[in-house]
Amino acid sequence: MSLLKERKPKKPHYIPRPPGKPFKYKCFQCPFTCNEKSHLFNHMKYGLCKNSITLVSEQDRIPKCPKSSSLDPKQTHQPEPTSKPATSKSLLNGLSSFDPKSQQGSAKEDAKENLEMQARGAHKGPQKPALQKEMAPEAILSTQPCLDSGVRHSAFVPVGEHRLRGPEDTEATEVLANSTTKASSFHAKSAFHTPGYPWKAGSPFLPPDFPHKISSTKGFGAISPYMHPAIPEYPHPFYAEHGLAAIYSPYLLTGNTPECETTLLSVYGTQDQRHFLSPAGPIPKHLNTSPSTYDHYRFFQQYHSNLPIPYGFYRPESAFPSYSLRLPSVTGITRDQSSRLLEDATLAYPASSPSELNLSSSHRKHTECEKGSPVPEAKDPSKDGQRDAEEAKMSPRAGSAATGSPGRPSPTNFTQTSQTFEGLCDLSNKAASSGTLERLQQAEQSPTAFKPVQRGSESPHSQPPANRTESPKSLQAMNGDPPAQTGSSNSFITEAPPSSPEDHSRIGPLNLSKKLETNPAATYGPMYASNAQADTLQDLPLNLSVKDLCNAWAPRPALPGPPQGAEPAATPKTETKGSEDRTSRVETPQDKAHSRTTPDVHTEDSSDEQKQTAAVALCQLAAYSPGNVRVADEEGTVQEPTRQDVPTLSATENLEAQCDLRPKGQKRTSQRDTGKSQQGTKKPKLNDPVPRVLTLRRRTRVS
């Protein structure tokens, strides 16, 4: 075995299987076949595809005839079940002048030869001379005078011909030698093609066909006859494999066959997917020509899932443009046919146009989802609008557990919350009357992040629908007069869980632990809810997004006095809770929420500061590092030197609140954190004038 020098595997790995038996394993990029995985493994390991390809391609033409003739007597009678159909079909085209006997024999032999050449591609080189010597006698054995293919230069003649033409045997070898030189020049290319071919389809018998087609060069001696059969023959498997026939062939084949042929060859040679798009050139013209092609594409949408790669590749370039063109014009049809596409697309699209697409499709989703709930939806148009807003807000939550990603936190919810705070207020108003239900929800909150929302929307069951109609009024009242504000703020406190899922979605990307889901969102939920009214007016929920940390931190110095005064009231509670943090998690949100009740009362006076406190609360969650929080707190204290006692308390309170939250996110013991943060906050209170510098120093120390 001459090739043994190049590689280590033992000869048995490359002993061809007896040609009649089907092979279990086939190299996916060259004609090698075998029945043992280890053989194939070695073949791949030592990268012998090149060997087998070159051997099959170039040495195929020389030893192929002799080899088949050498093994002829034994092989001709072993049926080749697997590859015979393919080769015999192709041979029947070429061998139409053969008599049936010779057709069958040569087909079988060709198939066997191919398989053997594939399997034996590795050690065929040394056998060449011997096989050529054997060729004359055995070919004489199988002489069939009917095959004077001096007349016929079919693609398949040479294979059978040299085998079956005994007397002209010597001439056959000469022809083979000549054509081998010529064809090897071409076949360098085709050997290169051959790997690509199985690559594309993996159909094991295309390479076998291929050597026959090449062998046509043997008989004919010229390359052009080979090239011509190649183009009619390749396109069929090529198209059929890739499903291009369905899509491209009408255009390609109708338009310009010469160009089509050249592109086919190039595609075939390079096996580069980008070339698949080059044949697609005609299609864009078609698309532009007539509007009916939109119907054509609409027609294809149903199939595009099953269609093979080239259509998938092509679709982004033309079909999606057509999508965007059609979204306005043909919306009805698009929604009917590709509603699934659109609703899936809502995940991709919201970034670009969340308001449109999300609202449309997620409304659809949620209306379907919540139609089941017997809430009297049509009681009031404003109620309906709010309900829709709720649904729009919740739809991402219902659809996917965690909307958004750390890099880009759920644009869907940010845009929607600006439009759906009415929904929030509606929810909270309902919640005011059904507080017990909300307690239940708070208990349920940890296992089900989404249920509270549904519950919140169902709470009207326990409540006359009049309350729902109230909600717009109460919206104005919240913005207008403090008494209504206090009432609704209490409702917000109970309502923390229902509003919290939406807050989760804001905080979602940051707090990935379940524990955090219950507490922080419920903690800051009330603030959001209470600020919802002011936010609806100014669309500021967007500024609460994690992206806007800078904007949110900056306003912190303007912290209102009242909120800070109110927070110390809860300081003892939260401090005790700090230690029991993990046990009483549900209470903590409520206590903290109550601690913020007073800020809620002041919303209409200091709605801006309230917004900022909400923002700061969120940002404290977002930026876990205690240093950042302290920066904000100290800025606040600098700006309010008169209230130094209260700021100290409230800052420590804030930090403790955050330490209560942080341990859940960061698995630290709340005691230690609280101690650290208290140290951190109390120090700069002593040196008030230079809080910034100390903050920087302490930030490194604590974090």
Curated annotation (Swiss-Prot):
Residues 67-106, 410-421, 456-477, 639-655 have a biased composition (Polar residues). Residues 352-361 have a biased composition (Low complexity). Residues 367-394, 574-611 have a biased composition (Basic and acidic residues). GO terms for biological process: cell differentiation; epidermis development; establishment of skin barrier; membrane biogenesis; negative regulation of epithelial to mesenchymal transition; positive regulation of ceramide biosynthetic process; positive regulation of gene expression; positive regulation of transcription by RNA polymerase II. It comes from the Eukaryota. A zinc finger (CCHC-type) spans 25-51. Pfam families: zf-C2H2_7 (PF15269). InterPro entries: ZNF750, ZNF750_Znf. It is found in: Nucleus. Keywords: Activator, Differentiation, Metal-binding, Nucleus, Transcription, Transcription regulation, Zinc, Zinc-finger. GO terms for cellular component: nucleus. GO terms for molecular function: DNA-binding transcription activator activity, RNA polymerase II-specific; DNA-binding transcription repressor activity, RNA polymerase II-specific; promoter-specific chromatin binding; RNA polymerase II cis-regulatory region sequence-specific DNA binding; zinc ion binding. Zn(2+) binds at C27, C30, H43, C49. Residues 64-113, 350-527, 553-614, 630-703 are annotated as: Disordered. Its main location: nucleus. Transcription factor involved in epidermis differentiation. Required for terminal epidermal differentiation: acts downstream of p63/TP63 and activates expression of late epidermal differentiation genes. Specifically binds to the promoter of KLF4 and promotes its expression. This is Zinc finger protein 750.
